Each structure stands twice: as C-alpha cells, then as structure tokens.
C-alpha cells in the first residue's frame, strides 16, 4: 500500500476535530470496492482485499467498528451522507510546460515559492502538474510509487472534486476547485498560472 498510516492518522485527527471526518465502505464484493475515510478537502480509498491491518485499525480507532458494505457515515453526527466521488478530468499537456518542470521525474514533489507543494507525473504524451496541500502530500509514499512496476494512475479533476493518486489498490484524493473558479489570491491558482501555457480541457 502506498499510504503512510501515521500521516493519514494525523489528517483524520484534524478532520475529526473539525467535525468533517467521514468513514465508509463500498461494496467490497465488487472489483473496486473498499474502505474510505475523508475530510473536508481530502479522501483516501483502499481496495477491500488490499486493506492492511494498520489501515483497518485506524478505521476502528476513529469509528469503533468496521463499516458494512454500502455504509457511509460522519463520525460527529452518525448520519448517512451522499457519495463524494466523481468528476470531469482535465490535463496539462507536456508541450505547454516549462522545461524546468518537464525535467522533474515521476512522483517528485517540490516546494514552490508560494509555499504549496507541486506534484508532477509524467506520462508518454502528457505531463500532469498540480499544487497540493503539503500535509496531504506527506501521506503518499512517493518512493514506493516510483519503485513499483505497476505505475499508479494519477489524474487531476475539476469542479471542487479531487486530485487522485493511485491504482487499483488505493488512491488519495485532494479536494480543490477548478483553476477558473479559484479566487485571484488562491495559492494553487498562482502556482498553476505560473506554468506557461496552462490550459484546461
């Protein structure tokens, strides 16, 4: 698994304190079913048969039990919530990205002058670039991602949806707005606009 449980626990604690922690379970009998936890701006999903004892222990620690298939609830209210997944993808083609960014290898994050973490993923015909919250980026084990033969799918979605890191086993979502909907003073917007030729498809 590519999730650092100690870092994830830190995010879960903050979300619980803020009253935004959600824990749920997809139908684990299905191919991509599994368990998930989420805060107000992030979500982590792990496929059912790949969930480690440590990950399940975190769920039990915060909820007192393992949720049943199809069950989703907020820790602070116990009320059923609607699904939080699904969005339209958009990409930043590699030919529009500055040479300095193109040189960054898969799975690398760098601190920008604006204080955000810039994550980069290189595909054969396109380069995906996005700014993420450092606390969330720390949850991902980029070393394991880069060493794994089965390169994870990493994509960027818009409309207050998610940036997803992952593959069939697990992924982490970082919630953010589409660049066109961001306030002018939004750090993530400034990071994206600083990359020459940023285009949304």
Place the predicted regions along the sequence by residue.
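C-terminal functional regions that serve as terminal interaction/effector modules
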Residues: 39-42, 53-201
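Intrinsically disordered, low-complexity linker/loop segments enriched in Gly/Pro
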Residues: 1-46
């Amino acid at each position: 698994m590519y999730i650092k449980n100690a870092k994830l626990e830190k995010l879960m604690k903050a979300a619980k304190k803020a009253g935004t922690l959600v824990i749920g379970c997809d139908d684990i009998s299905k191919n991509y079913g599994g368990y998930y936890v989420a805060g107000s701006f992030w979500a982590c999903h792990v496929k059912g048969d790949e969930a480690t004892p440590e990950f399940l222990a975190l769920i039990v620690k915060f909820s007192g039990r393992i949720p049943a298939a199809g069950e989703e609830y907020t820790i602070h209210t116990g009320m059923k919530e609607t699904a939080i997944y699904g969005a339209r993808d958009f990409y930043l083609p590699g030919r529009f990205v500055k040479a300095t960014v193109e040189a960054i290898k898969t799975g690398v994050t760098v601190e920008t002058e604006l204080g955000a973490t810039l994550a980069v993923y290189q595909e054969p015909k396109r380069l995906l670039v996005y700014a993420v919250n450092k606390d969330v980026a720390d949850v991902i084990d980029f070393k394991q991602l880069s060493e794994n033969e089965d390169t994870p799918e990493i994509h960027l979605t818009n409309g207050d949806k998610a940036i997803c890191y992952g593959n069939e086993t697990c992924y982490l979502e970082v919630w953010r707005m589409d660049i066109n909907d961001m306030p002018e003073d939004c750090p993530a917007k400034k990071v994206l606009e600083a990359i020459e030729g940023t285009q949304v498809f």
